[in-house]
Amino acid sequence: AEEYLKMKQYQRKIKNITGFKPFPGTLNLRSSKEEVKNTLSQVDSIRISSFSFEGEEYSGVDVYPARVQGHDAAVLRMDVTDYGPEVVEIAAKHKLRETLDIQDGDKIKVDVKNQFQSESS
């Protein structure tokens, strides 16, 4: 998703949905395939349809509202990805790995919610 999040077309669409301009990269978390499926099935996503730009085709993505340890975020489920269904890609306004001082192997709480709301600043 990093390549996509660097593109203004995705940034604009995600900002329109989430209210924040996403950092151009994702925090990738691993869970069980069943847990990911069960959690995401409980909330509605907002769909970004696939599109063409400068002769290239770009994948659609389902965007789910979430919070990661107090920070507004979005779970991104790309139609085309290098990861399996057990990997969750999370976009946020900031680089969550640095903001939350996350190390490989850390357990992270992700709350998937029913709607996006702005972070208070």
Residue ranges and their predicted role:
Residues 10, 91-92:
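Active-site glycine-rich loop that binds ribose-phosphate moieties when present
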Residues 1-84, 104, 110-111, 116-121:
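Long, compositionally biased stretches
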Residues 92-98:
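Short alpha-helix capping/helix-loop boundary micro-motifs
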